[in-house]
Amino acid sequence: MNRNLLIALSLVPASLVFAADPLYQAKGDHARTYVHPNAAEPQPYRIFVPSTWEPGKTMPLVVVLHGGGSNQNTPFERNDNILAKEAEKHGFIVVSPLGGGPSGGYGASYAPVFAPGANRPPPNPGATPETPARRISESDVMMVTERTAEEYGVDRKRIYLMGNSMGSMGTLYLAQKYQGKWCAIGPSDGPVVPSSYEYDRVTYLSGAIFVHGDHDTLASIDATREMVQSFRKAGIETKFVEVKDGTHTGSWADVLPGTFDFFDAHRCGR
């Protein structure tokens, strides 16, 4: 995302940015939109704010990236909206951006690592040379993160990032690009080529929790295992949760309480 644009946005008073939004500082589960300066139409995102939040109260934030072919609502639809339930229980604000579209890639250029014999989908836009759509996808995540942090006064030292499949690759990409932005990360069922990753760029993280289902027939669990070892060698506290009978799309939700526990235990800035 253009750094000058981020600086300019940070100087705009919140009262002006949200003046026309009837859901400004609303609690609960809501569908929201905002105007992205480079997108053809308003960009949607989904947000959950715990009932215990009130103006002036600081809470941590979890940014959740959906998988390819999905949208900002998909993470909330798994396991009877366990995402909102765990956020309420742990006292976290959760936001899920669209990322510019169902398969925007969040700016990542990594090639996916498939499981042996996987029925490979068409190439993901996230694995192609940089395009305007990819730039919008990346900046959408960062703008929604900033918008939410400004609106709800979140603890900026406790912003966490997680995602599944394409969202996992986006998580890994944004973690190494925006150093110091994230406290800890949670990639699931979406490794990148282990030898291609810049582990030295994520040593600032307080921790990483990787999740992968042992019945994932699309993404390589062996590649995830290799990434876990490389994270540990880089000195990052790393947990690996291998989900028994876990599938490509559902494993992350099956063990989500543990992911929130992990994030809650990793409190940056203290």
Predicted segments with their positions:
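Alpha/beta-hydrolase
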Residues: 65, 187-188, 243
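A domain-start/cap signature at the N-terminus of enzymes
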Residues: 17-61, 129, 137, 166, ...
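Alpha/beta-hydrolase fold active-site loops
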Residues: 60, 92, 183, 206-207
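C-terminal catalytic histidine-bearing segment of alpha/beta-hydrolase fold enzymes
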Residues: 208-211, 217-270
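Primarily recognizes the serine-hydrolase "nucleophile elbow" in alpha/beta-hydrolase
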Residues: 77-79, 146-153, 157-204
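Bacterial N-terminal signal peptides
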Residues: 7-15
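Positively charged n-region of N-terminal signal peptides that target proteins for export
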Residues: 1-4
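Serine-hydrolase catalytic machinery in alpha/beta-hydrolase-like enzymes
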Residues: 31, 38-44, 57-153
